[in-house]
Every structure is written in C-alpha cells, then in structure tokens.
C-alpha cells in the first residue's frame, strides 16, 4: 500500500506534458460555440499556440479558445516597437476571435548606420536592444546591442539597410571582382594572399595557359600527331629560308651562314652530310646544293621545344585577347533579345524608305557607270585615232608637210594662207638646209584642248545627272490662297504646295501640325485649336473638313490635314494607294446605266475591271453616241455618278469648287478643272477615263438641262460670319476687347463671360477663353476644362477646381492677346458654372486619416474623410457627439460648414498613419578645394555621405579615350566666332569620351570630356499584395450530433468552408450523443502566411532619362534629356539621334529588396503558380479545397486537424528570375524599377563654345600660377587639383605632369583664374605635385588621404568604378597589359630601388648587342659582299672595254 502511495505521489509531482512549448502566458481567451484547432507558430520574437478547452453548461457544450505566447526575445520591448507597414520584425498577432495574422513592426530606438569603406563592412550602433535587417544582394537580420558589423562580399552590393526606425538604400562596389576572393577564402589561404592572387589573376591565367599549351605540345612532339602543326611552321620555315639564302653572309670555310661563335657544322641546310668543311664549301659553291629545305626545317620545328614554347605563348595571348574575363560576367545575367517592334521609330521609317532610296541609288549607279564606260571608250578611241580627233582643230597640209590651225584658215587651191608655218611654231627654211618633220609636239596643244573640252562636258553631264534626282515641281502657295476672297481652281487641295514630304509627319498629332504651321506663319494662333481638334483618322478628318462652311476655314483645315498626310494626293499619280480606296470602291459598287446596256464598251470595262482604260475615250462617240438622246433622266443619273466619284476622290475644297461650278452652271470651268486634274495625274488611268467621260457628257445637248444632285448644295460655302452665333443681330457687344489684358496670379473671377473671336487668318471661331472683370478693360483667361465653381464666401466670385479659390486662372499668351486685339470678338454667357450649395458642405465626418498638408502655398491641417474627400480642420480630436463613434468635427463644436478641397491642391502630407520612409545616399558638392580637403581628411569612413569636388564631379573614374574633333563656327581674322563641336555618344551609363578640339588648320586648342553620368529606363510600380509560405492555418469548427450539415456555413471574409457528414459513431461522439452514421463536422479555415514576397504592378509608362555632362578645365555642366524633347540651351544642343525602346515587366515581385520577374498572378487571380495566396489590407485571400481529418475521443468532442486549406504554390516563386540589370528604389507603397545597363540609343550633341580667338593666342605666356591638390593614391576618387592662374592674354596651354592628367590642354583666359584638374597617380609624388602649364612650372601643394578604401558607395542610378573598368578593359590581355607587366617588373624595381634605370639600361644593352651580333652583322656582311661583287663586275667590264 505504501508503494502504491509513493508511486501515486511521484506521478502527481511530475509535470504535465504540453504540446509546442512549456509555460507561456495566456494572451487572449474567447469562449465560443466554435472551436479552434491547435496551432503552434514562431515569429521573430516569440512562439504562440492556440488550443480549445471544452466546457459544458445547461445550454450546451462550448469551447474556451485560448492563445498562449512564450517570448523568445524577452527584452524586445526595450527597443520601443511600433507597428508600421513594411517593417522588418514579423509578429503574429491574435484577433478577438483568436484568428492569427502577421503584422510588421520596427524598433523606435535610435540606430546609427554607417559603412566602413576600408574593411567593406556595414557598421550598426545603438544604445539599447535593437533589430536590423540587410536586404538585397545579401540577406541578414538579427538582434544586437551596442555595435555590430556585417561584412560585404559581393562585387557590387545593392542594399537596403534597416536598423531601428531608419532605412537607407545604396549601391556599393569593390575595386576588384570579389568572386575570386570569395572562392579562395574558402581555402586555407590567408586573406592577404587571396587578395594578391586575385589582383594578378590575369597574368597567372596567362602563364598557366601558356604552360598547359607548352606541355600539350611537348607531349604531342613525341608522336606523329605533332605534324598536324606543319601548316603553321612551313610558312615560317619558308620565309626563314628566303632570308637565309639571300640576306645572310656566308662562312668562308663551310659556305653556310656566318656563325662567329660556333664551329662549322657537318649538315648542310639541304639535308646533306659532309665530314669536312671543305667538302661542304664545295657542295655549296658548286651549285649542287638545292637550297634551304623548308619542309625539313618545319618537321624539325614540330619536334623542337623552342618553337613549341613560342607557339604556346602566342596561342595563349591570342586566346586571352578575344576572351572576356569570367569575373565580369554576371551569373544568370539575362541576355537581350531584340524584337522588330522594339526597334526605334526612325529605323522603321528608314525601312519604309529604303526601297525608294535603293531604286534611286541603282539608277544613279547605272548612269554613273554608263558615263564612265563611255568615257573609257572615247579615251581608247582617242588614243588610237588621235589625228582624227585633232583634225577638228588643225589640218594636215600635204603640200608643205605641216599642220595648220583651222581658225582663220583660207585655201588657195592646194595651198593655204598658213603654209610654211606649222602649229608647233616652226617655219620652212628658205635655204632648204633644214626640213620640217612632223612630231608629237605639232598637235600637243590641240590634244590637250580636246581633252579639256571632253572633261568639261563630262562634268556637266554628271552634274545634270545628280541634279535630276532632286528636281521637284512646285504648286500654289497656301498663304496666297488665304488672301483670295473666293475659291479658285489652283487653291484646291490637289494643287496646293506642300513642300518636302516626310513620312514621319503621319505620326505627328494635329496639335504638332498646328505648331509647325504657326512657326511657318501660315496660320494664326487663333487657328490652332481648330486644327488640333481634327480627328486622327483620315475618314474623320475628311468629314471634319467638309463640315466647315466657309472657304478659308475649310482650306486651313484641309491644308493641315495634307501637311500631315503629305503624300495623300501624290498617291493619285499611280493606279493604287490608300487615298484612292474610297472612290474606286464607290465606282465598283455602282453601275452606269449606259454600261448595263453596253457592258463591253471600253469605258465600262475600265470602270468595272480596270482594263481598256487607255482606249475608253475613243468609243464614246461610237457605241454610246445615241444612248442618251432623249433620255434626260439616264443622262442625269450617269453624270451625277461620275461627279460623285470625283467627290469621293477629291474631298474638301475640290468638292466645294465643283459644287460652286455646278450651282453657277459654269460647265466650261468645270471641264477645265477636271482637265487640270487629269494633267496633274496623267498616270491614273481610271481617273483619266472618268474625266474624259465627264467631258464627253458635257458635249451632249442634254447638258443644258442637267440637274445635279441636291447633295452638292450642302457643299456650297456660306458667307463668313460677322457676329458671334450666340448673339442676336440687334445686340451690340458691351466688352471692349481692344484693351484686353491677361493678368497673372488671379484666383477669382467676377462677371465671368465666354468670349468668341474670329481668326484674322481663316475666320474660324475661337472660343477657348473667358473674360472677367470690368467690360471696359476686361481680363481674359484660358477656358477651364472643368468649368468654374461659385465661391462659398462671395456668391459673385468664381473659382477653379473647388469653391476655395486656391488655383490661378491660366493666363493667355501675349501672342494670343495680340491676335485677340486684332480680331472681331463678342462676349456670351458662360454656361459651365457650378453653383455653391449648402448641402455640398459638411460639419463632421468619419475620419479616415489626418495630418498636415501643403495646400496651394499654405500648410493646412487636413482631414481625409471616409468618402475620400479632404476638408480643412483645425481640430482633429473633437468628436461629434451627435454621430456614430469615429466621427470628428471639422470645426470647434461642429459649428461651421466646411466644403471639400480638390485633391490636386493637396500635396506633401504627413499623415498620422505610420508610413515608412527610406533614405538615400547624400551627395555633397563642395566648391572650395580647402573645404573638400577637410571633408575627405576627417576619415568619415563610416559616413553614408559622399563628398564631391564640384568642378570635377562630372568626370568619369577612368581617363577616357580621346579623339580629335575639328571646331566649327564662323571663321574670322581672330579665330572662330560662335564656335561649337558636334559629336555622337552612346546613351549608356558610364560611357565617356574625350575630345581634343583642334582648329581647321590642325592646331590643338583644348580638351573637353563628355560623360554619360546616368542613363536609365524606369517605371513606378504600386503594391498589389503580399504572399508567402503557409506557416499555419486558422480554423473554426463545430459539430452536430445528428442531422445533416448546414446548407450555408457561416464564415469570415476570405475563409474557406469544409464539412463532412456521418461522423457520429460508437466511440466517436461527445458525451450524451447517441448516434450511429449520423451527424456532421463542419467549419472554416484560412491560411496564415509569412509575408516574404510583395507583388507590384506597373502604373506608369517607361521613362527614359539620361544625364549628359561636359567638363572643361574651368567649368562643368550637365543636362537631362529624354527621347521626346530635344534640349536647346546657351551651352548645349542635345537630342536623341536613335532611340532604343525597352519594356519593363507589367508585374514584378520584391523579396528582400531584390526584383524578381516571371509568371506572377495579378491581384484577384488565383491560378496555379506564384501568388495564388494574396494578403490584401490584412486579409488573406485564396482558393482551394480544404483537406481535414479528425480524431475521435470517447465521450468528448472530436479533435479536427486541417491539413490543407488554401492552394498555396509559393514554391513556384523560387523559380522567378532576378534580372542583373535591374535596380530598385523603394518608397512608401510604391517602388521604382530602374534598368541601368541598357544602351538607350545614340545621343547627338552640339556643345556651344562661344568665341575662340585662337589666332591671337600667344606661344609664350607669362603667368603667375599656384595650385592646391588633395585626394588619394590608388583609390576611387584619385586626386583633384585647383589651379589659380593669372595672365593678361589668352592662350592654349599644354599640361604636363608626372601623373596622368585627365585634361592634356586647357584654354587660359584673363577673365578666368580658377581651373580644376583630375589627376591619377600610381605612386606618391611627394609633398608637392609638379604640373607644367605653358612652360610655367607649378609646385601644387598636395594633401593625401592615408585611407585605402576598397568599397565605393554610389547612388542607385549611377555607375561605379569597377563597371567603367570592365567596359574599358574587356579581355584578359587588356588586364595583363594594365596590371600584369607592372607586376612582372615590380620585384626588380623593389630590388634595385632608384638604380632601376641603370638595370633596365644594362638589360636593354645586352639584348641590343645580341641582336646586332646575330641579326644585324650577318645582314651587313652580306650587303658588303654583294656590293663588292658589283664592284668586281664593274672592273671586269671596264677591262673588256
């Protein structure tokens, strides 16, 4: 018994087992009919579990649902957490119904964020417990106290660092690629050795590859496979054989090539072997030796290690010259695929024009070659028959055997008046001692004359040929037609002069067309609204034109339409074209009565089938001669059909002119006009047939009784209006618009009236303005699109946008004012007035948010109500006791009615709802060099601020490659006035180019550096939802002992329901339930997700932004440009020449400050894949079929286990891609996605230089100079210098320094004294830096920073040093050239110190001596022997003579 008691005591003393965790505190209880399932979850600070404890009373069985939390970070409250959107501390909260959901928090305790650039570590410091998160290319988070460091190891880190309430995003890059360092850090090598190896990895690769190739060739030389290299060595051996036989001195003893340091050999170069040198010499001298055997030498080279070693070095160099380093290739980088639709618009336009240009080029090419061939044939004929060609200018006289000039020649029988005198100038000798002989000189000047005339004719033919390409006919000028009062035939559309036709005009909106016409002074500014309202489609534009009732208005609208579609009537020159579709279809769908009877008549066949059009005129008088006789109705119908076809072909003024001629019965003028059209378009066969048919119909007698269609009366012009349509004829205008003004900063308007004016150019009604104020001196403003609002304070005053009069009325330009003063104007009642009513205002509302906002120019307290309207409220804590809870008074005691404020007036609000803000890198531009020195010498290595010297801030990291460019402008006696340079530069971030500006004579004037500081394509994205993996399932369930499941199961928003019937059975039922195969278990569930991925959707179109900078020695300036608007300033003229268009993805996902793209569900779409569970405004949505099970307990309720609720395919999100070229800027609720690695096009730049009087520059300049430099050695920023130069003359000065200077030549003027230079030094030059300017030596003081930063910080949209270095040096051999050779020579430099020059001289002398002995001396001796042979041969020849 005692044992039993002891066992019972021990059992009672042991702790009761609890699931998930022991202990914990109850945070919430909720007795309910529905029970929750057991859930155990962990967040960043605690663990939490829920369980159901059943209780029973008189009313039934209930569940006491309990939530228990156990803290893992017990002191996390010390950091003063606060709930915030986008926080980095995930905490699971318990709802009133014990449903679990995740919320985000941040700590309020202050935290200092810094970056140590020398150790590449992020430094975080705080005074209490705090939490940090680093997201981006690396992801780390945790709790800390005091100070912690996080090491960066990626080559370029794009990070968002969050600590406490602070968040900052920045871009940081190392000075070398870190993939090699990270790899070697995993081995036993120390960090310093790993860094040294990676810094010289290129030369290590070169040496290793050379050795591998050499070993491979050495192994192959042991086999016959080595002879595969024969094609490589045969040309070398053959070339060596030629040099051996012809260029080298021979040994006197053996006859082989001169060998001063070795004995005579036994093997000849031909392969023969001799025991003695005498036999060898006899073999060589007797001519028995066939010469150097190249094939034998090539075989020896294939087996030899010497050629193998040389070949291995050459092969390694060639391989590494064309291979990109592995380090500069980003793993997983997306490759660009260019689609045709993404090509620039100008390239598409070029594709449309290429066929025409190709035809012109072919014709020009054929004619040019034809002229060349003809010229060559004539040249050959001239060479063979010169005398016959020369006979045009001179004749041969057989009597005196001389040539005589034909000019002034007279014949006397067989003699002439020029006998005894030749064209060469020789006279016949009277004594007969000397006889004249015909020579080449007799006709040489006539041959030259003929050739000169031929060349002149040839050049004239070439000029005529090239000029014929650009010949263009002229039409009637538009401005001339506007001056005519009535319409004329030459002022209709087909005959208007449209100038040069460019097809890109079709893409211009009519607003731009109006601006162009206004710039050409073709229209008035009052005509522009009418032109801008022309419909964009052609059919709508033609209808719009025909609706105009006066000649000048219709002509103006038609001219604008033809200016856009400038080839509209040019299409009529042929038998097809987009502008001919309507009238040709109209003819095909209508039949002439005559053609029904005579379908084979040529005219009918032309109209219906398009054939026999050329002969349609010939049989009008044959088959159709008597058809219309006595048939006036058929005559009228057919002629109206032909005229209607002309109407569909020539709309607008042409149709109006035809209607005018018909109404006047001016048949002759009508026929004359149609003939003009036929002459204008002679190649249009169908149009010619219609015109001829109309002319034939006019010749018939029925024409006198012709009744044209009533349709033509609608096309007749009406008289131009002299009063506004809204005014009666008897009323007179009361406003004096001759004194009209348009005052600025007017927020209220009294006596508002609408104004109608007639354009002085076209007479069109202009009603885009309103008038305010006194009728004797009214003010006019642009008519508002939303009307005007009556002020709530003054009923006679009107405002814009709302009733508070916060917005200025838009003023009218001075150009429009001048036009209004010259025009006829009337006032009218303004109809769009919104009256102020008391019911529009409220005294209180349910507040949605509150804060202080910028309203116009003021800072007002604003309340946003539940109806999303904004109101002024000086009190934001006064409840309205007459309303429901949550209503706040807008005024003290709800005494004043407040009216809504237009949202566009509200900006920059500080709402009370917590919203996170993310800071960026601060860039400070310092103008003074001394202040810059102080800023960088304070060792603020942990600061997240960048300090830039203002005068050199726009220079690249690496000195650019220079190109020579000639200065342009107006040349004068002193130099160039209005000088400028033009160039092109790719729109790629980090691209730089140097310009060495020269005069037209080639004189170097100055250096300028162009730098694309940033180039990006970006879009703004708004948040849709968050998603993540399922960490648990919220469940509510109940059960019925008997009966079916409920038809409708109550559930909360976003919850899914489940049910299962026949769950009651023996041993599986609650206490008191006696049922078998009956009852039901039912409930609802919802996933608890951990917020890991946020999905955003694109809200704005892609914005292309490029910042281009030019830097001189004394100034620097930048401009931002986009592909749409060219930039024209006093310093710059910049525009995109070509534009590459890119499209950013519509939906992106953000995880840990990293962009992911791919197949992601949109908001409200729950298809299989990433994002099919969505958390929106704290509610989780999804779909699926819940899977659940239950455990039976004897006489107790069932334990429900929900195994799956939503279909969550979050695993698919892991397959999303992370584009390497995308960068991210986060903001409250939105993100900006930036693509910064694309070439956005080509920028055409024109830099204005002003007057450059280089011809007056002095060669010897007397100046006083001093300088100050500061910076660092082998770092990112290098050294910046400020020079103070004083001189009295202008000069172009070269700059020479022991270090690399970015500008090699500067322009010095008396008016400018401060000049800035950027210098790169690889070694410390001393306490001063020597710079020579125009032979003036400047010892600039030098203050160097000892810090050696290995990490560079940069704003998100700018490039870093490592990327510019990769772009400049893309191959391994380039890296070897920049670093490897220096590394090879570095040990010798350290060994010899200052005597390195003597060592280099000694080595070079030895190499030169060896070259002289083995190469130069044999060649010289061979040359000496050759000269001696020639001397001996000369002496032998002299003896023979």
UniProtKB/Swiss-Prot annotation:
Name the gene behind this protein.
Answer: GP
This chain belongs to the protein called Envelopment polyprotein
Disulfide-bond pairs as recorded:
none
Origin, by domain of life? Viruses
Q: How is it modified after translation?
A: Specific enzymatic cleavages in vivo yield mature proteins including nonstructural protein NSm, glycoprotein C, and glycoprotein N.
Site, Cleavage: residue positions: 473-474
BP terms from Gene Ontology = fusion of virus membrane with host endosome membrane; symbiont entry into host cell; symbiont-mediated perturbation of host process; virion attachment to host cell
- Its source organism is Bunyavirus snowshoe hare
Role description: Glycoprotein C and Glycoprotein N interact with each other and are present at the surface of the virion. They are able to attach the virion to a cell receptor and to promote fusion of membranes after endocytosis of the virion.
Q: Which UniProt keywords apply?
A: Fusion of virus membrane with host endosomal membrane, Fusion of virus membrane with host membrane, Glycoprotein, Host endoplasmic reticulum, Host Golgi apparatus, Host membrane, Host-virus interaction, Membrane, Signal, Transmembrane, Transmembrane helix, Viral attachment to host cell, Viral penetration into host cytoplasm, Virion, Virus entry into host cell
Which residues are glycosylated according to the annotation?
Answer: 57, 490, 1177
Which Gene Ontology cellular component terms are annotated? host cell endoplasmic reticulum membrane; host cell Golgi membrane; membrane; virion membrane
Which family is this sequence assigned to?
Answer: Belongs to the orthobunyavirus envelope glycoprotein family.
- Record note on quaternary structure: Glycoprotein C and Glycoprotein N interact with each other.
Q: One Pfam family, short name please?
A: Bunya_G2
Q: Which residues constitute the signal peptide according to the record?
A: 1-13
Q: Which residues lie on this side of the membrane: Lumenal?
A: 14-200, 327-365, 474-1395
> Which residue spans traverse the membrane?
201-221, 306-326, 366-386, 453-473, 1396-1416
Where are the Cytoplasmic topological domains? Answer: 222-305, 387-452, 1417-1441
Upper lineage ranks? Viruses, Riboviria, Orthornavirae, Negarnaviricota, Polyploviricotina
């Amino acid at each position: 018994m005692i044992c039993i008691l002891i066992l019972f005591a021990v059992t009672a003393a042991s702790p009761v087992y609890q699931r998930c965790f022991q202990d914990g505190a109850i945070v919430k209880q909720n007795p309910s009919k529905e029970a929750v399932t057991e859930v155990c979850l962990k967040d960043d600070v605690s663990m939490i579990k829920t369980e159901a404890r059943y209780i029973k009373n008189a009313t039934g069985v209930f569940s006491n649902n309990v939530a228990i939390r156990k803290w893992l970070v017990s002191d996390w409250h010390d950091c003063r957490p606060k709930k915030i959107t986008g926080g980095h501390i995930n905490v699971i909260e318990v709802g009133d119904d014990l449903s679990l959901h995740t919320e985000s928090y941040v700590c309020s305790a202050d935290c200092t964020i810094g970056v140590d650039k020398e150790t590449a570590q992020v430094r975080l410091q705080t005074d209490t417990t705090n939490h940090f998160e680093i997201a981006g290319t690396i992801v780390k988070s945790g709790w800390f106290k005091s100070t912690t460091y996080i090491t960066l190891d990626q080559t370029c880190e794009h990070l968002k660092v969050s600590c406490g309430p602070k968040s900052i995003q920045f871009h940081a890059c190392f000075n070398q690629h870190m993939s090699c360092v990270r790899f070697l850090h995993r081995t036993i090598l120390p960090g310093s050795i790993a860094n040294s190896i990676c810094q010289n990895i290129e030369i290590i690769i070169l040496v290793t590859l050379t050795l591998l190739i050499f070993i491979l060739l050495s192994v192959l030389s042991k086999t016959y496979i080595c002879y595969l290299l024969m094609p490589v060595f045969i040309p070398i051996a053959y070339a060596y054989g030629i040099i051996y036989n012809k260029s080298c001195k021979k040994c006197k003893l053996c006859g082989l090539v001169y060998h001063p340091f070795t004995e005579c050999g036994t093997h000849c170069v031909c392969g023969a072997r001799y025991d003695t040198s005498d036999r060898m010499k006899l073999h060589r001298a007797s001519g028995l030796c066939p010469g150097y055997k190249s094939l034998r030498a090539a075989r020896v080279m294939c087996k030899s290690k010497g050629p193998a070693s040389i070949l291995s070095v050459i092969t390694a160099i060639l391989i590494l010259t064309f291979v990109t380093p592995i380090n500069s290739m980003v793993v997983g980088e997306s490759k660009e695929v260019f689609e045709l639709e993404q090509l620039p618009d100008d390239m598409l336009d070029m594709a449309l024009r290429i066929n025409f240009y190709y035809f012109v080029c072919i014709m020009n090419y054929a004619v040019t070659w034809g002229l060349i061939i003809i010229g060559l044939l004539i040249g050959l004929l001239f060479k063979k028959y010169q005398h016959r060609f020369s006979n045009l200018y001179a004749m041969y006289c057989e009597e005196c055997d001389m040539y005589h000039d034909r000019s002034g020649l007279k014949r006397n029988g067989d003699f002439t008046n020029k006998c005894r005198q030749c064209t060469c100038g020789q006279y016949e000798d009277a004594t007969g001692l000397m006889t004249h002989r015909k020579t080449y000189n007799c006709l040489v000047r006539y041959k030259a004359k003929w050739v000169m005339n031929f060349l002149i004719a040839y050049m004239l033919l070439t000029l005529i040929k090239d000029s014929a390409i650009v010949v263009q006919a002229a039409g009637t000028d538009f401005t001339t037609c506007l001056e005519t009062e009535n319409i004329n035939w030459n002022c209709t559309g087909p005959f208007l002069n449209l100038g040069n036709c460019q097809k890109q005009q079709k893409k211009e909106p009519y607003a731009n067309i109006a601006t162009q016409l206004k710039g050409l002074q073709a229209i008035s500014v009052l005509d522009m609204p009418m032109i801008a309202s022309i419909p964009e489609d052609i059919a709508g534009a033609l209808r719009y034109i025909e609706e105009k009732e006066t000649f000048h208005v219709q002509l103006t609208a038609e001219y604008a339409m033809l200016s856009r579609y400038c080839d509209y009537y040019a299409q009529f020159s042929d038998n097809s074209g987009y502008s001919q579709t309507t009238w040709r279809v109209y003819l095909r769908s209508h039949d002439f009565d005559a053609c029904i009877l005579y379908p084979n008549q040529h005219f009918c066949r032309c109209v219906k089938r398009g054939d026999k059009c050329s002969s349609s005129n010939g049989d009008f008088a044959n088959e159709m001669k008597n058809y219309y006789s006595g048939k006036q109705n058929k005559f009228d119908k057919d002629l109206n059909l032909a005229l209607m076809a002309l109407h569909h072909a020539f709309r607008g003024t042409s149709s109006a002119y035809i209607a005018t001629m018909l109404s006047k019965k001016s048949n002759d003028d009508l026929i004359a006009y149609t003939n003009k059209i036929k002459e204008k378009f002679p190649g249009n066969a169908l149009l010619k047939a219609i015109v001829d048919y109309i002319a034939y119909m006019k010749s018939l007698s029925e024409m006198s009784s012709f009744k044209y269609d009533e349709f033509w009366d609608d096309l007749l012009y009406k008289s131009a209006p002299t009063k506004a349509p809204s005014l009666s004829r008897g009323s007179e205008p009361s406003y004096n618009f001759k004194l009209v003004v348009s005052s600025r900063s007017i927020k209220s308007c009294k006596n508002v009236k609408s104004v109608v004016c007639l354009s002085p150019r076209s007479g069109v009604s202009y009603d885009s303005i309103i008038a305010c104020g006194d009728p004797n001196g009214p003010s006019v403003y642009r008519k508002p699109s939303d009307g005007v609002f009556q002020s709530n304070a003054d009923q006679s005053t009107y405002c814009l946008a709302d009733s508070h009069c916060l917005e200025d009325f838009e003023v009218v330009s001075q150009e429009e004012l001048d036009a209004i003063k010259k025009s006829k104007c009337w006032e009218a009642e303004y109809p769009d007035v919104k009256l102020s009513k008391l019911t529009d205002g409220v005294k209180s509302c349910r507040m949605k948010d509150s804060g202080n906002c910028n309203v116009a120019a003021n800072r007002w307290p604003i309340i946003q109500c539940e109806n999303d309207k904004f109101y002024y409220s000086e009190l934001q804590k006064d409840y309205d006791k007459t309303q429901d809870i949550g209503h706040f008074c807008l005024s003290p005691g709800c005494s004043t009615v407040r009216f809504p404020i237009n949202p566009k007036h509200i900006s920059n609000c500080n709402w009370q709802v917590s919203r996170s803000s993310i800071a960026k890198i601060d860039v400070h531009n310092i103008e003074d060099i001394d202040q810059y020195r102080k800023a960088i010498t304070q060792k603020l290595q942990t600061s997240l601020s960048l300090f830039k010297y203002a005068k050199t801030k726009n220079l690249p990291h690496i000195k650019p490659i220079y190109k020579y460019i000639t200065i342009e402008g107006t040349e004068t006696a002193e130099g160039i006035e209005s000088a400028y340079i033009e160039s092109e530069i790719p729109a790629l971030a980090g691209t730089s180019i140097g310009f060495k500006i020269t005069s037209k004579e080639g004189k170097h004037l100055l250096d300028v550096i162009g730098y694309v500081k940033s180039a990006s394509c970006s879009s703004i994205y708004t948040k849709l939802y968050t998603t993540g993996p399922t960490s648990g399932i919220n469940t509510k369930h109940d059960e019925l002992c008997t009966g079916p499941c409920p038809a409708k199961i109550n559930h909360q928003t976003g919850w899914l329901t489940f049910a299962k019937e026949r769950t009651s059975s023996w041993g599986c039922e609650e206490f008191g339930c006696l049922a078998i195969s009956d009852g039901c278990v039912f409930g609802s569930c919802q996933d608890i997700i951990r917020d890991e991925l946020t999905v955003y959707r694109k809200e704005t179109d892609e914005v292309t932004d490029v910042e281009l900078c030019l830097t001189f020695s004394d100034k620097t300036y930048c401009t931002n440009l986009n592909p749409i608007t060219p930039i024209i300033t006093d310093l710059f003229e910049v525009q995109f020449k070509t534009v590459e268009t890119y499209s950013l993805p519509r939906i992106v996902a953000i995880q840990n400050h990293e962009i992911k793209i791919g197949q992601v569900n949109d908001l409200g779409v729950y298809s299989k894949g990433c994002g099919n569970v969505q958390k929106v405004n704290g509610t989780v949505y999804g779909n699926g079929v819940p899977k659940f099970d239950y455990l039976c307990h004897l006489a107790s309720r069932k334990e429900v286990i929900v195994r799956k609720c939503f279909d969550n395919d979050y695993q698919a999100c892991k397959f999303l891609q992370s584009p390497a070229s995308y960068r991210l800027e986060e903001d409250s609720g939105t993100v900006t996605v930036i693509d910064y690695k694309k070439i956005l096009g080509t920028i055409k730049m024109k830099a204005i230089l002003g007057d450059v009087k280089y011809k007056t520059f002095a060669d010897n300049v007397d100046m006083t100079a001093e300088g100050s430099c500061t910076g660092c050695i082998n770092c990112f920023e290098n050294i910046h210098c400020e020079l103070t130069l004083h001189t009295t003359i202008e000069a172009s000065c070269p700059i020479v320094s022991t270090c690399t200077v970015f500008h090699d030549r500067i322009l010095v003027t008396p008016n400018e004294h401060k000049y800035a230079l950027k210098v790169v030094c690889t070694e410390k030059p001393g306490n001063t830096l020597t710079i020579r300017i125009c032979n003036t030596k400047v010892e600039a003081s030098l203050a160097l920073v000892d810090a050696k930063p290995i990490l560079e910080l940069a704003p998100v949209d700018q490039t870093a040093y490592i990327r510019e270095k990769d772009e400049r040096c893309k191959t391994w051999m380039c890296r070897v050239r920049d670093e490897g050779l220096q590394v090879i020579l570095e040990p010798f430099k350290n060994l010899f110190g200052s005597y390195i020059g003597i060592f280099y001289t000694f080595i070079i002398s030895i190499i030169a001596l060896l070259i002289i002995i083995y190469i130069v001396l044999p060649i010289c001796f061979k040359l000496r022997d050759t000269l001696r042979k020639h001397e001996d041969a000369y002496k032998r020849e002299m003896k023979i003579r």
